[in-house]
Amino acid sequence: MIIKPKVRGFVCVTAHPTGCAAHIQQQIDHVKSKGPIKQGPKNVLVIGASTGYGLASRVTASFGSGAATLGVFYERPSEEGRPATPGWYNSIAFTRAARAAGYYAENINGDAFSEAIKQQTLAMIARDMGPIDLVVYSLASPRRTHPKTGAVHKSVLKPLGAPYTNKTVDTDKAIVSEVTIDSATEMEATDTVAVMGGEDWEMWIQALADAKLLAPGATAVAYSYIGPVHTWPVYKDGTIGAAKVDLERAAMAINAKLAAHGNGRAFISVNKALVTQASSAIPVVPLYIAILYKVMKAKGTHEGCIEQMQRLFATQLYNGSKLQFDGAGRVRVDDWEMRPEIQDAISAIWPQVTTENLATLTDIAGYQTEFLKLFGFGLPGVNYDAEVEPHITF
């Protein structure tokens, strides 16, 4: 079939297999261009491995350090007349490229929150890999069925305490408008922590430890975002921020467990704001990202997921580097984004932005290009008018 982008709201409902493979190749090429990452991981488990930061971590581990990787994700294969999700195509492309380069790459497609998928993962690690020395936890999910209670928790992106009004942008139509987001109920706040907090990460680490599948000195990392004051009511001080506080609680608990197990470590890496499937869904944030891209590109400090993860691995995690923590014990690769001159420039632009000047004051075009790239569209060297086979498997 011929596959074209179909955007509905903040999601594209089609994905292009050849384009997704080209996007993966771009990421591989970037990591290889930076040279080997020494003293890197050997056996890596990535939970949430099919898109965004999780996928970029997987690419960096294999093509930077030659690591064997097992990716866990929840993606939909193609159906009659309908392409698969981009994460499905991404994971196939990564797996083929990694194996062609001589690296072990396996995948488990299913609900990472479930006990069954954890057991399946442990069995595969025990059979094929041996103890894991890096666990990357990078799940973004709208819901979680609790493995112990069976309760279904749904996450929401809402402020806490009071409704919040600010500017936002419809990234598809390039229209700036004001949006008011109602505040979360207590139940919504609790549910969001249950989905996006640290409990499941702890369960994964406990399961690996119980099965004796954590290497001495193992590292566990989860990803977070803090961002600037413009986004705080809906992000840092909202429901998702409360979940990230719980993730930090979990990091400390896991760190204590791993430290006692051969000097291991666990921490949160605070990453840069980027166009991802997850961030597109958050009101206010896409407008901030469009301005951020404009400012950082002008300064020559713009990074995407793969640049961020390559830098995290090469300058913080491995290569004989020492982790640099902030006052709260977090690693910061949002450091370039949060530089005062970048944030001051954004604060100056923010009040001025309208639909009419959006194209000049922000990088909305760059945002739209990056967004479509997530789904395999707009990649150089891909013929989007050609028939392509949507039904591909591992």
Question: What are the roles of these predicted feature ranges?
Answer:
Residues 1-29, 99, 230-394:
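NAD(P)H-dependent oxidoreductase Rossmann-fold/reductase module
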Residues 48-55, 113-115, 140-144, 226-230:
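Gly/Ser/Thr-rich loops at beta-strand to alpha-helix junctions
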Residues 106, 120-149:
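A glycine-rich helix->loop->beta "capping" turn
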